[in-house]
Design a protein with these regions (language model features):
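Inter-lobe coupling linker of SF2 helicases/translocases
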Residues: 1-92
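Short glycine-/polar-rich loops that comprise or flank the Walker A/P-loop
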Residues: 10-12, 166-167, 191-195, 218-220, ...
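Conserved interdomain hinge at the start of the Helicase C-terminal
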Residues: 26, 35-47, 146-174
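Glycine-rich phosphate-binding "P-loop"
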Residues: 131-153, 199
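Conserved helicase motor "Helicase C" RecA-like lobe of SF1/SF2 P-loop NTPases
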Residues: 174-198
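Conserved helicase ATPase core of P-loop NTP-dependent helicases/translocases
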Residues: 193-226
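Conserved RecA-like helicase motor core of SF1/SF2 enzymes
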Residues: 202, 221, 227-258
Length: 258
């Protein structure tokens, strides 16, 4: 309309990274496991759909971060043999999609690692298959740090560049475990001159406000957050760049058909 506005010009940039050899090898092992797990389902009741959602959840966690894979293992998989399995009368798609995929409903969305479908699928597995899955997730959790985690290394590079250009970035992550991992790694690599804080769904509204209030006292600052901050908190006053660590994805693209 020819009139100046108070809104800054939005610049969107996509960047790429290549997984390290160690992460690539792990991902290929996980992909093979997921394919075999779904194919091995007996098809009784909802078992195959449960395993399908478990496979997507495993892939999401491994691709998000080593910490997200480790969180599933720590929170749920140690209790494998105690689970009764998924309810045959329940709808797996309705039960698991709020955890695994991006949703528009704030009441359904969660930033916790999607361990429920993995736990329910594990209850249908024989012991060797359970042990194989646990070993994969343990191996994934060992790849933490920029040496083996190229996604983290690329993010560190981007954040350093933004800070050098006097930006104050937010790094958005899908899962709590990933956000805490990224914040810890960024703080370690960036040093004491930069303040890095994670704010996630594990914090109350008051705790979120307090953590952000403390953070904005620092000239060089990085906020790492999940979508818990998508509503109710005005971030534009104190931050002026965004990095999306976990992009929405289609499982059919990440998991090509054989």
């Amino acid at each position: 309309m020819g009139a100046d506005t108070a809104f800054p010009k939005r610049e969107a940039v996509e960047d790429n990274y290549l997984m390290s050899p160690a992460y690539t090898a792990l991902y290929e092992r996980v992909l093979d496991y997921c394919r075999e797990s779904v194919a091995a389902s007996t098809g009784q009741g909802n078992q195959q759909r449960v395993r399908y959602w478990a496979a997507i959840a495993i892939l999401r966690c491994v691709l998000s971060s080593p910490a997200a894979a480790g969180a599933v293992l720590t929170n749920r998989l140690e209790g494998f043999d105690l689970g009764p399995g998924a309810d045959d009368d329940a709808d797996p798609d309705a039960a698991y999609s709020p955890q695994v995929m991006e949703l528009t409903s704030e009441e359904l969305a969660t930033d916790f690692a999607p361990s429920a479908p993995i736990e329910d699928a594990a209850a249908t597995m024989a012991s060797p298959e359970q042990k194989r899955l646990m070993a994969l997730l343990r191996d994934a959790s060992k790849l933490a740090g920029p040496k083996n985690d190229a996604k983290l290394a690329k993010t560190l590079e981007l954040v350093r560049s933004l800070l050098k250009d006097t930006y104050r970035p937010i790094v958005f992550c899908r899962f709590i475990a990933t956000a805490n991992y990224v914040a810890e790694q960024l703080q370690k690599e960036l040093g004491k001159s930069v303040r890095v804080v994670a704010v996630t769904g594990e914090h109350s509204d008051e705790e979120r406000r307090e953590r952000i209030a403390d953070l904005v006292e620092h000239e060089q600052r990085v906020l790492v957050a999940t979508d818990c901050l998508s509503e109710g908190v005005n971030l534009q006053q104190h931050f002026d760049a965004v990095v999306h660590y976990d992009l929405p994805w289609n499982p059919n693209r990440s998991w090509p058909s054989s």
